[in-house]
Each structure stands twice: as structure tokens, then as C-alpha cells.
Design a protein with these regions (language model features):
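Short, Lys/Arg-rich, polar N-terminal cytosolic tail immediately upstream
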Residues: 1-13
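Terminal transmembrane helical module of multi-pass membrane proteins
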Residues: 149-225
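Internal transmembrane alpha-helix with an interfacial aromatic "cap," most often the third helix
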Residues: 67-98, 144-156, 216
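Alpha-helical transmembrane segments of multi-pass membrane proteins
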Residues: 24-43
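Hydrophobic alpha-helical transmembrane segments of integral membrane proteins
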Residues: 92-124, 178-191
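Interfacial segments of alpha-helical transmembrane regions
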Residues: 13-21, 87-103, 160-169
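Membrane-proximal helix-loop-helix units in multi-pass membrane proteins
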Residues: 107-151
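Interfacial helix-start motif at the membrane-water boundary
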Residues: 51-71
Length: 225
């Protein structure tokens, strides 16, 4: 079901949809900058969050760059909600996934600012335990929302390519998320690598969703289901 908007408003939303691409670029930039400042950082073993831990040499610059990611990422979540409510409605299942994504990202932005890792040794302190708890909730949200997005879009049978991508994203994200826990406990020397597959799959999904809105704003209208 289409909600009437002016062409200018639709164009503005399509342009703002690119905030998902910008957010992902900021995210990767904070990783690159952090590694430059921390030459001994081991990306195969260490998680990305080590780069912004309070005790990390890279904390200052990496955290400042991450503010750019936070801003554009939250903007992207807002655009997703508006676009698929006022411009194009898919169905309730798909939209529920978008709402859960927004909730997860707000929790991530606020939670990680309040409780960054205290150190890179992952000691059992209150601050670190809160960081782990927030991570657990966010990962659970993303497991559920990835399934909601994939199932919701697949139900329409209108966008097979995008449906396949979301199904693949769900598989990669859920599998790599579970493997991260297992590898961290049994093969910690590869924990950082597996975690990156998980996090970078999320960044790729944001870029694809962003470009999908940007290029498909005029031809992805569907009946509300």
C-alpha cells in the first residue's frame, strides 16, 4: 500500500537512505585507524571492541570516529522506518524486523557508550560484564530481526534477489555469531576473525538495504500483507 508523498520527499528519503553506506564506511574507518595506532593489535584473535576499550592506545581516535558511525547508523534506522511505513509497505513481519533493528541499534549506541570495555584483558569487572550483557541482547535481537526480514520479504514473492540476500545474511550472521562464542572458548586465537565475519556481514547488509532503497524507491511498491 502506497502512502502519498511528494516526489521531493521520496527523493529526499532515497538520498538519506545512503546514510547506511556512510555509516558502514565510518565503522570500517574506526577499525583501520585503530589498527594504525595500535601496531601490535591482532585482528585474528582480538575483537573489534578492543580498539575502543578504555585501556587501548587506539581508544581516543577510534571512539571519535565511531561517533560518525553512530549518527549515520541511527539516521539510517530512522529512514528505514519512515520509508517502509510511508513510501512502501512490505508486511508486518518485515516491518517488525526493522523496528527491532532500530531498538537494537539504539541499545548499541547508548549501551556501549555507557559501558565500553574497561580493558583488553576482558577481566570480570562490572563494566565489562555489562558490556557483555549488552552484546548478548543485541546479538539476540539481530538473530530474530534477520529472520523477520528474510521471512517477511520472502512472503511477498516479489523480490527474489533481495529475498535470497536476506536469507543468506541470516544464515551467515547466525552461524558466525554462534561460532564466535565457540571459537572464543576453544580456539581463541581465531576469535577476532570469526567475530569480523559476523560484524562485517551486518555492515554489508546495511549497505545493500541502503542501495536497495536508493535505487528502488520508484518500483518496489507492494500490497500490504
Amino acid at each position: 500500500m502506497e502512502t502519498k508523498l511528494t516526489l521531493g520527499n521520496k527523493g529526499s528519503l532515497s538520498l538519506l537512505a545512503l546514510s547506511g553506506v556512510v555509516a558502514s564506511l565510518f565503522y570500517w574507518s574506526h577499525v583501520v585507524a585503530g589498527r594504525i595506532l595500535w601496531p601490535s593489535y591482532n585482528p585474528l584473535a582480538q575483537p573489534v571492541s578492543d580498539l575502543t576499550a578504555n585501556s587501548a592506545v587506539s581508544q581516543g581516535l577510534a571512539s571519535r570516529i565511531l561517533y560518525g558511525y553512530d549518527f549515520f547508523n541511527l539516521l539510517f534506522c530512522f529512514v528505514l522506518l519512515v520509508f517502509f511505513r510511508r513510501v512502501t509497505r512490505i508486511n508486518r513481519t518485515f516491518y517488525a524486523g526493522l523496528v527491532l533493528k532500530a531498538v537494537a541499534e539504539v541499545l548499541s549506541t547508548i549501551g556501549y557508550k555507557l559501558f565500553p570495555l574497561a580493558d583488553t584483558e576482558w577481566t570480570s569487572s562490572f563494566q565489562n560484564n555489562m558490556h557483555y550483557a549488552i552484546t548478548g541482547v543485541i546479538v539476540l535481537c539481530y538473530i530474530v530481526l534477520s529472520l523477520l526480514l528474510a521471512i517477511g520479504l520472502a512472503k511477498t514473492k516479489k523480490h527474489p534477489a533481495m529475498s535470497r540476500f536476506l536469507a543468506l545474511f541470516s544464515l551467515v550472521f547466525i552461524t558466525s555469531g554462534l561460532l564466535t562464542v565457540l571459537v572464543a572458548n576453544f580456539q581463541p586465537q581465531y576469535a577476532g576473525l570469526v567475530e569480523r565475519i559476523n560484524l562485517y556481514s551486518l555492515m554489508v547488509s546495511n549497505i545493500v538495504l541502503s542501495l536497495w532503497m536508493f535505487t528502488g524507491a520508484k518500483d518496489i511498491g507492494l500490497k500490504d500483507a
